[in-house]
Swiss-Prot record:
This is Alkyl hydroperoxide reductase AhpD. One of its GO terms (molecular function) is disulfide oxidoreductase activity. Disulfide bonds join C131-C134. It is an enzyme of class 1 (oxidoreductase). It comes from Streptomyces coelicolor (strain ATCC BAA-471 / A3(2) / M145). It catalyses: N(6)-[(R)-dihydrolipoyl]-L-lysyl-[lipoyl-carrier protein] + a hydroperoxide = N(6)-[(R)-lipoyl]-L-lysyl-[lipoyl-carrier protein] + an alcohol + H2O. It comes from the Bacteria. GO terms for biological process: cell redox homeostasis; response to oxidative stress. Keywords: Antioxidant, Disulfide bond, Oxidoreductase, Peroxidase, Redox-active center. Antioxidant protein with alkyl hydroperoxidase activity. Required for the reduction of the AhpC active site cysteine residues and for the regeneration of the AhpC enzyme activity. The lineage of its organism: Bacteria, Bacillati, Actinomycetota, Actinomycetes, Kitasatosporales. Homotrimer.
Length: 178
């Protein structure tokens, strides 16, 4: 189970995705923890069993136990936050924005890894889940911490490719079962 296995599973009509897997993940300039934490968090967020099954072992091999757990935590807490804050943002009644959230999200304050890495993973998950409010918030925290736009873009490129591969392979699995 690996990036190479996943690339091999991508159908010919989606050759661009196969090439992007190789360039965006296989040849990334991100430090290993940022790269593989982003890969794991976005694989979880993609909701694709195939993608998660193929990428998780390689991510686990490249992350410390703390980073592995933190990347999963980023995917979990952002699954909740992205729905909550996206809904609050999209409602035409802006009074919801003044109400207390009342949701526990302690892991954001104490993720067990470098907070910049956790923010990057949270940002990438937010890209998949489409929460503009969360994207802006995490991007601002990253920029204030000195993270350059190129690094931030790498995270959402990973998110885009992982999501697209998940959609494609899950569709192929359904079509093959017919």
């Amino acid at each position: 189970m690996s990036l190479d296995s996943l690339k091999s599973a991508v159908p010919d009509y989606a050759k661009d995705l196969k090439l992007n897997l190789g360039s965006v993940i296989g040849n990334s300039d991100l430090p290993a923890q940022q790269l593989w934490g982003t890969v794991l968090a976005t694989a979880i967020a993609s909701r694709s069993p195939i993608v998660l099954r193929e990428l998780e072992p390689e991510a686990k091999a490249n992350l410390s136990p703390e980073a592995y757990s933190a990347a999963k935590s980023a995917a979990a807490v952002m699954a909740m936050n992205n729905v909550f804050y996206r809904t609050r943002h999209l409602l035409s009644d802006h009074e919801y924005g003044t109400l207390r959230a009342g949701l526990r999200m302690n892991v954001i304050g104490n993720p067990g890894v470098d907070k910049v890495d956790f923010e990057l993973w949270s940002f990438a998950v937010s890209a998949i889940n489409g929460c503009g409010m969360c994207l802006d918030s995490h991007e601002q925290v990253l920029r204030k911490a000195g993270v350059d736009r190129e690094t931030i873009q790498e995270a959402f490129k990973i998110a885009a490719v992982v999501e697209a591969v998940g959609v494609t392979l899950d569709a192929e699995a359904v079509l093959a079962a017919e």
